[in-house]
């Protein structure tokens, strides 16, 4: 199969895990899905980058200057990269007493068409291998404005905090003059996050046991990752846009890798949804709390607790204690 299901969820049996903006678009305008859980990197809101050789040190130095914004020519999928550029640029300007009226926004269309390239369609042992088919830390597919900035066609560009921007900065050609991750306000941490886990309503209704099994796996992997952050970083470095394993570790060391549907994280999802609707990136609004389906995460957590209870009590007692074998809530 090609890679469009990750963006338009056109497979009934797909459980999709990734950035926030594509599943918002799917739920709003394409088909009904269920939000199963999210994981949040709470301090990666985005940065503004300039050429190191230019006399630009503060955002106010960009008054009247050109800031680039990309535009995907791909009509099949959501233009998630542009959305986070748009949102991030607006927020950085606002935090510095400026608006879009103070700068020149220069649009850069690009093909964005790699999703069905022949090299992307070869068999894989694991779906997460898709990044391994690409030199993702060095190719510019997710840094589409870097060349324009280097050539001086624009004066500044958006990038994500810590991830991606570190790869740009490491060249020595560029410098970061504003970083949303430095602010305490969670509303500024909007770079296509929190990452969302979604499934179709078809799968949720016809095969809930598969959804629960998947969420059990996500909880177990998340717990392992929380307890073994360096080992997790070595694995994740193969797919992330940090510099290397140690940089990946620094990026994830304070991140809770177990998915949840906390009120704060749902509010962050609402932040992204509201922006997309207000700016016309989705046609239809929807209630994020109705989209959320916590029953699968709850059942998965309960089953894992029961399995652990059984394992522990079986080794200590002549027969398994039955305290968790009821559907009644405990506590």
Predicted regions and their residues:
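Short, glycine-/small- and polar/acidic-enriched structural segments
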Residues: 1-120, 161, 323-331
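Well-formed, non-transmembrane alpha-helical positions, independent of function
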Residues: 25, 61, 147-148, 166, ...
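Short linear loop/turn motifs
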Residues: 104-108, 249-257, 287-302
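Secondary-structure end/capping motifs
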Residues: 204-283
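Conserved C-terminal helix/tail region of periplasmic/extracytoplasmic solute-binding proteins
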Residues: 277-331
